[in-house]
Amino acid sequence: MAKYVVTSAWPYVNHVPHLGTLIGSVLSADIYARYLRLRGRQVVFVSGSDEHGTPIELEARKKGVHPKELTDQVHEYDVKMWREYRISFDNYSRTESPVHKEFVMEFMKKLEENGYIFSQEEVLPYCERDKIFLPDRFVEGTCPYCGYEKARGDQCDECGRLLHPTELKNPRCALCGSKPVYKSTRHWFIDLRRVQDRLLKWLESHGELQDSVKKYSINWVAQGLKPRSVTRDLSWGVPAPFKGAEGKTIYVWFDALLGYVSATKELFIMRRGDPEEWKSWWWDSGTRTVYFIGKDNIPFHAIILPALFLASHDPYVLPWRISATEYLMYEGQQFSKSRRIGVWIDEALEIAPADYWRWALARMRPEARDTNFTWKEFYRIVNTELNDDIGNFVNRVLSLVRSRMSGVAPEPEDLGEHQGFVERVRRAAWAVAEDLEAIRIKRATEGILEIAREGNAYLNRTQPWKLLSQDREEGVRALSAALYAVKTLAHLLAPFTPDAADRLWSMLGLAGSVHEAVWDEWLDRPLPGGARIVRVEPLFQKLPDDFLERVDEIVEDARRRAREKRPPLLRD
């Protein structure tokens, strides 16, 4: 059986993540990892806090603290947030982890020994006012490819192109806004040209890559790869291990990409004290590695990371799948901390429970194009889908069992004409499984809704409350079929709304947790006869009728309450 390493892009810890970050990588990866576990697969789910690089150093400078003071606070807070959102990481690490730093340094030394690393003088922007070189986000300017005026020195957020700081037009220091001069400094480079042919062959032949990822990456590599600097003139980061590179650090993207491996290594050290077990995953050709990222991270995961693995000469498995989402917009605009546009993940929890956000964001997941988060759509999803469709069906069935069957599930028997409904539910359930297998997360939610809506229509059509009085055996058959659908919903909701799914499992009188019920053993089974439904409570609660009228007030209040709970360095 294949093993799976599931990863989500490492969030920067310069601030609290917003909803786009949540669905773009972390939540999508969690839904998939939970699904795999429910299919009985061996899974390692890892990510971590990306603490290094210019975004962190810039934010720390603004706050007048050392970067480590900032990242310690944000990392601890993010861990708390992931716990509240029920993100089921096996290990959520950090780039300041000693295991990670040692791994990155050893990996880079291996590349140098293999002949892929060389050094040369490079001319870079330098701020005479701040007395520092300006790598990456320390310099801003106009993108030479698309004309975006706020491109960074390493990448344009508008067109996604990787950049060199000297390519920017009208450059300016991100700290003071002054125009930089250009000075020479020595840096170490990885010669990507030496892996270009192997990389292109892999990209063209690998059938599991998402079409958008594959086309984008093939086009990029076919244009010719250039050597890329792996060092920076920064003190904050993983120290560069090359002779003569004292005082320099590894470029944050090479640093963070290797975190997927180091987090796995750290996991097995923590679990079993074994510093070598990670190799049985990352060096095993039977392992499938699945990366959940935003589309702006495609070149790093589809080109740079496999290039690093190829250059190591070790038997690393190359990416099996890369699930890259488009952007989630907020009421038609891009999320922006500085302009207070959007909702951040801690603020969201002040408005509604985690399950509501998990389901709503899965429904809005930007899989093929940018999608737009609106409060009107959030309100509809919570009140109509979670409550009127799913919650209402569950409540109707369980209430009938409580009131008309003394809370005892009937014994499974020949369901007669009601077997047709059961078969439709079974087919729909396995279609949801197929969608999750293929990482069609949004379509999987549509399949779940189809079962709930079909269930409500089935109740309206068969009216088991009347049948139980007129023809009790026929009424019991109808109710048994409906109970099968409710139990099926408990299984299917587990990756999406884990708390609600577990409550429903308990209400059905089933022992243990729904998250331990492997689908291949449980999904086709009816609810066991004699199962006692001792309590019935609403699975979800509706948002208030005046929610949309008061949403601005509700959001501002949520921001205030979330800000009060944040660590001191995150309260601005």
Curated annotation (Swiss-Prot):
One of its GO terms (cellular component) is aminoacyl-tRNA synthetase multienzyme complex. GO terms for biological process: methionyl-tRNA aminoacylation. Zn(2+) binds at residues 143, 146, 156, 159. Keywords: Aminoacyl-tRNA synthetase, ATP-binding, Cytoplasm, Ligase, Metal-binding, Nucleotide-binding, Protein biosynthesis, Zinc. Its main location: cytoplasm. A motif ('KMSKS' region) lies at residues 334-338. GO terms for molecular function: ATP binding; metal ion binding; methionine-tRNA ligase activity. It catalyses: tRNA(Met) + L-methionine + ATP = L-methionyl-tRNA(Met) + AMP + diphosphate. Its EC number is 6.1.1.10. Its cofactor is Zn(2+). A motif ('HIGH' region) lies at residues 11-21. It is found in: Cytoplasm. Belongs to the class-I aminoacyl-tRNA synthetase family. MetG type 1 subfamily. Is required not only for elongation of protein synthesis but also for the initiation of all mRNA translation through initiator tRNA(fMet) aminoacylation. HAMAP family: Met_tRNA_synth_type1. This is Methionine--tRNA ligase. It comes from Aeropyrum pernix (strain ATCC 700893 / DSM 11879 / JCM 9820 / NBRC 100138 / K1). The gene is metG.
